[in-house]
């Protein structure tokens, strides 16, 4: 059965084991059980993770349409009031699953990815889960400099990434990374956040999860 369309261990994960947890309840289990993402099981299915199937089994529910969400616990403190942002447990869990995958991938190893994501969330005054998912897919449209960075080292790293210099150790160390980093910071007029310095670079952002009426008036334009 497809739990999104219309199915005995009760997992109670310790806080911190998951990027996001949703407490679901059903007529058969009004106290509810926690389901967490990303799924850590051996069987990986983006639509029906083990964690969700085990949760539905514990709730004696065939689908999420038979469930209600009671609580949400998210690892990013900037995202608040998530439970009130959704009309159905099904949509909430869909987005929680995707959030778990975004968290697990961490930008496929891109440097400073998590700090950049959190800096963008702060810049855009984002408190919604759906908008956070969209911003995670639009990070290439933001310039970012981490806090506490070695300006010269980061400037060299940025120059290689931007194709300004080849990834040659000899050329890289001879390059004035500090001047390049400072020039980029000045060009974009970066804002200061708790996780670094960030600004929208003017690229066209695409939105898959969030609706325009839920975008903050502060969204950079």
Identify the meaning behind each predicted range.
Residues 34-36, 47, 170, 187, ...:
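Generic alpha-helix signal with a bias toward terminal, lower-confidence helices
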Residues 22-24, 35, 53-54, 132-135, ...:
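Generic structural hydrophobic/aromatic packing signal, biased to beta-strands
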Residues 6-42, 219-221:
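Short, extreme N-terminal segment that most often corresponds to the first beta-strand
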Residues 178, 182-216:
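Long, highly charged low-complexity segments enriched in Glu/Asp and Lys/Arg with interspersed Ser/Thr
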Residues 1-11, 41, 45-169, 173, ...:
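Mixed-charge (acidic/basic) macromolecular-recognition segments
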Residues 25-29, 151-156, 160, 169-170, ...:
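Residue-level signal for functionally critical sites in structured catalytic/ligand-binding pockets
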Residues 23-30, 57-59, 193, 201-202:
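Short, flexible beta-strand-to-coil junctions
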């Amino acid at each position: 059965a497809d739990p999104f369309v219309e199915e005995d261990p009760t997992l109670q994960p310790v806080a911190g084991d998951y990027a996001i947890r949703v407490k679901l309840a059903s007529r058969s289990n009004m106290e509810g059980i926690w389901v967490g993402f990303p799924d850590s099981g051996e069987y990986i299915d983006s639509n029906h993770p083990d964690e969700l199937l085990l949760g539905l089994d514990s709730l004696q529910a065939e689908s999420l349409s038979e469930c209600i969400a009671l609580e949400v616990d998210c690892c990013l403190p900037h995202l608040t009031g998530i439970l009130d942002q959704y009309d159905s447990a099904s949509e909430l869990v869909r987005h929680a699953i995707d959030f778990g995958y975004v968290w697990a991938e961490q930008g496929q190893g891109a440097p400073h990815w998590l700090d950049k994501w959190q800096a963008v969330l702060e810049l855009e005054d984002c408190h919604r889960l759906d908008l956070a998912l969209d911003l995670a897919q639009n990070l290439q449209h933001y310039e970012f400099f981490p806090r506490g960075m070695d300006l010269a080292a980061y400037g060299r790293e940025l120059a290689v990434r931007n194709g300004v210099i080849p990834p040659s150790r000899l050329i890289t160390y001879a390059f004035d990374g500090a001047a390049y980093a400072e020039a980029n910071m000045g060009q974009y007029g970066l804002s200061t956040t708790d996780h670094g310095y960030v600004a929208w670079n003017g690229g066209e952002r695409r939105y898959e999860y969030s609706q325009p009426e839920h975008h903050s008036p502060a969204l950079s334009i």
